[in-house]
Every structure is written in C-alpha cells, then in structure tokens.
C-alpha cells in the first residue's frame, strides 16, 4: 500500500455479495445513485485501501451486478469476502453540484449557531434507520449529540465557506440532558 493510499479518503460505494457461479465472476451491490457509476471509479478497495476488485465487465443481475474481475480468485475466496464493503477514493468521485454534498465531506466541518466562532464540529453522519443524523461534538460536552440532517434543523451547509449552521444547537444538547433525568 502506498503512502497516498494511507492518506486518501475512502468512500463505501458497494458491497461484495459473493461468487457468481464457478467461472470467477462475483456479485456486487452498488450503493451509488446511478448504480452503473460504481464501475467508473477504478479499482475498488477494502477499508484499508487494499484493492479487492478491479472490474473488467459488469452486467445487471436481479438486485446486483455480475462482475468479471481482473483478480483471479477461487469461488471460495470470493464467498469468504461476502459482505466486504467496496470503497473508492474520494478524489475519484465527481464534484457535487452546488446544492449537493457527499456525507464524507461534512465530517470535521465546524458547526456555527449565530456567531462567527464555531461551537462544535461534525464527528460523523449516521443513519440508525429513521433518517440521516449529524453526530456533533461540542467541546467540553460529556457526549456527542445527534441532529437530524434536514433543512429545518440544519438550514445552512455551505461547502464553499466550509461551515454548517445549526441555530438551535443548544436545544439538541439540552434534549440529551432532559432524556437523562
């Protein structure tokens, strides 16, 4: 693994679903909005940056793609990799439109309320089944808080200025304290 691979940001783009038959093909589920786009990002890697799958060809299956990979593994080897996430390097993805963003790009962004000084930062973007949530770290707070990633709760995500505005951040922080009592 090169030094570049160690520092690159990897984005989960799909998942291996195991072997397809005995001729070396594999089943892959795409997470991308345009499922075919998964195969335009070059070799797909595991979370450590090691190349797992270099697609040569891909054809649609029922809820997945059947891929002929460059890698020559046995059926049992591909089946052992079932469930492994396939990542692409962030720099391989197209730039988001002006009013769009990648969740990965929100991580580490400062969070403002009304002032000019950041009051928190985004630790992660989570989804526990009921919608996307920003996991927010507030300096000195005992735990992170979760804020729904909606226009009502997060009215400003300014990628150019590298800032997120959550005017009611204190309400979310206080809600966690209310739940504990």
UniProtKB/Swiss-Prot annotation:
InterPro entries tied to this protein: PRC-brl_dom, PRC_barrel-like_sf, RimM, RimM_N, RimM_N_sf, Transl_B-barrel_sf
GO molecular function: ribosome binding
SUPFAM superfamilies, sorted: PRC-barrel domain, Translation proteins
Domain PRC barrel: start-end pairs: 98-172
GO CC terms in record: cytoplasm; ribosome
Biological processes per GO annotation: ribosomal small subunit biogenesis; rRNA processing
Family annotation (Gene3D superfamilies): PRC-barrel domain (2.30.30.240), RimM (2.40.30.60)
Functional summary from the UniProt entry: An accessory protein needed during the final step in the assembly of 30S ribosomal subunit, possibly for assembly of the head region. Essential for efficient processing of 16S rRNA. May be needed both before and after RbfA during the maturation of 16S rRNA. It has affinity for free ribosomal 30S subunits but not for 70S ribosomes.
Family to which the UniProt record says this protein belongs: Belongs to the RimM family.
Comment text on domains: The PRC barrel domain binds ribosomal protein uS19.
HAMAP family per the UniProt record, alphabetical: Ribosome_mat_RimM
Quaternary structure (record): Binds ribosomal protein uS19.
Protein name: Ribosome maturation factor RimM
Species for this entry: Hyphomonas neptunium (strain ATCC 15444)
Classification of source organism: Bacteria, Pseudomonadati, Pseudomonadota, Alphaproteobacteria, Hyphomonadales
Gene expressing this chain: rimM
